[in-house]
Amino acid sequence: MFDRQAKALSPSFYFGAFAVLTVIGFLAPIRVGDLPGYDDARYTVVAKQIVLSGDWLNTQYNGAPDFEHPPLLEWIQAAFFSVFGISDFVAKVPSALLGWGTVLLVAWLARRLTGDPIQGVLAMFALASSAYFVKYTARAMTDVPVTFFFLAALCAWSLTEDSAGWYLAAGAFTAMALMTRGLIGFALPAIFGLDLIVARRRPRWGYALAALAVAILPLALWYWRLIDHYGQVFFTAHEAWLDREAFGTLSPSWRRYTGLFEYMFMLAKSYWPWLPFAIAGIVTIIRGRQRRLFVLLIWFVVVLAMCAAAKSRVLRYMLPAYPALSILSAIGLAALIPVRFIQRGLLFATPVLAVAVLAIAIFPPVTYHVPEIRPIASAATAATTSGERVAFYDQGAPLYDEVNQMLWYGGREILFLLSPGELEQALQARQIDVFVVDDATYQTRFKSRIAHEVIAGAGHLVCVRLSL
C-alpha cells in the first residue's frame, strides 16, 4: 500500500492532481478552433435558437420543429449561452465539464466497488488517458453528457445497498440520460434489473417502481407534448429518423448480424494501452466470482448489445461503457502488477502528465472545419434582412455539415437545395435573392447567365445576390 505518512504518495494526492490536470486539459484546448458541422453545429443551432426566441419548449431547427433527440443537451447549452454569450467555446464547455465530472465519478465508483483507493486512481487515470473519450470531451455533442448521466445513475445504484432513497437518485439520472440521448438510456433499467438477479439482491419494490416512474416520466411527457402539438407530422419525421439511425434495413442485409463483431473490432483497434488490462479485469472478476463487481460486466455487455443492434454503428455510441472499461482496466492492472510498481509508475506518470497538459493548454492544437463557411455565412447574413432565407447548393450533395455551420455562424434560415432541378426551381421562383453555391455551379449557371452581384467568395463557395 502507499505510504500513509507521505501525502505525496497517497491516493488522495493523485486524485487531486489528476482532477486539476484533467479540468485544465479538457477546458484549455476548446478555447480555439470551431465546431464541426454535422452534429456539433446542429445541437448548438437548436440551443442558439432557444436563447434568441426565449422558447425552451418548442425547440426549432432551421425554422422547423426539432424531432431528433430529446433536448437536455440543448437546454444545458442554452443556459450557458444565456449567461456567458453565444460562442464556439461556450458551446463546448458543457461537454468538457461533464467529461471532467465523469473522470471524478469513475474514481469514486471504482473505489466503492473494489474497496481500494488505488484502483479508484487507476480507473480515473485510465479514463482520462483514453484518447477516444478525451476527443469527445471537446465536442459539443451528446456523447460525453450522456456518459456522465449514465455513470451518475450507476453510482447512485451502487448506493441503494445502503439506503433505499438512492433508487430515486438513480431514476433521476436515468431520466437525464434518456432526455439527452433517448434510446441508449434504456440500457440503465436493463443493467439494474440484471444486477439484481446476478447479485441476488432483493429490491425495495416501492422505491424501485417510483424510480422507474421518475426515469420514464420526463421522456414520456416530452414525446406526449410533441405528439399532441404535431400529430402525424411528428410520427412521420421521427419514424424516418429512427429508420435512418436505429431500426432501418442495412445493406447488405447480413450486416444486421455483424454489429457485435464490428464494435469489438473498433475497440480492439482503439482502446489502447488499456485493452489488455480491461481483459485481465474481466478474467479477474469472473475467476473471483465477486458478485458485487459483476455489474461492470453487465454494464459493458448491455451497452455493447444495444449499440450492436442499431443500424448506425460508430464507436462513440459506446462511450457510456467507457467508465466500466476504465474500472475493469484498473482491476486488471492491480491484479497483474505489484502495488509497489504501480506506486512508482504513478510517481513518474504524474509530472509527465502535468507537463503534457500544460503544453497543450499553452499551445492547443487548432483545427478548423470547413473554414470557408464562416465568411460566407457572415456575408449572407449581412446581405439579407431578418425573416429572409438563403438558398444553399453545393453540387447537389447532401452536405448537412455545411448547412449546419451556415445556420450556426449565420443568422438566416437555409433553403437546402439537393438537385439541379431544385436549384432551377428556386431561381425561377425568385422568392429568394441570396444564393450560396459551389464555384463550379457558379461558373456554369450564374456567371454571364443571370444578373447578379457577387457578395463574397471563400474556398469553393460563392455567395451571390440576384439582381432585379
Over which residues does each language-model region extend?
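Transmembrane-helix motifs of polytopic, lipid-linked glycan transferases
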Residues: 93-114
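Signature aromatic-anchored transmembrane alpha helix within multi-pass, membrane-resident enzymes
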Residues: 289, 333-361
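Short periplasmic/luminal acceptor-recognition loop of GT-C membrane glycosyltransferases, typified by
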Residues: 189, 360-444, 450-466
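Transmembrane-lumen/periplasm boundary regions of multi-pass, lipid-linked membrane glycan transferases
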Residues: 176, 185-289, 304-311
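Membrane-interface transmembrane helices that cradle and orient dolichyl/undecaprenyl
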Residues: 112, 117, 153-169, 177, ...
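Short acidic/glycine- and proline-prone juxtamembrane loop motifs at membrane-interface regions
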Residues: 95, 135-145
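Hydrophobic/aromatic-rich transmembrane helices and adjacent perimembrane loops
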Residues: 137, 311-338
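Extracytosolic helix-loop segments that constitute the early lumenal/periplasmic catalytic or substrate-binding loops
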Residues: 24-27, 42-65, 71-75, 79, ...
